[in-house]
């Protein structure tokens, strides 16, 4: 699996969870919450063998504009739906990072980060 295929696989698992939740397979410049945004975590790639890496993907669960009450409950629902779906699809998650502001399109959103991991191989690049 390549890194792009890993991102697409995670997005495909999350997309059908709720018709009201948008799913983005990569970074975007604006969102309408609630939304899942797949972006690379830090560290992104960890070497595990020759030409083989463990990729770490952050699924940002952006629940609502930065406002404690409605966003927090929505955020908990998103995480509660995403974790079993990822487990059922055999995509291991490492951790759920604490709630923190997430900026997109010059707006602040209440968000959590689900960190997933998968072995990947980098595609060959021809000059």
Predicted stretch roles:
Residues 36-38:
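Broad, structure-driven detector of short, well-ordered beta-strand segments within folded domains
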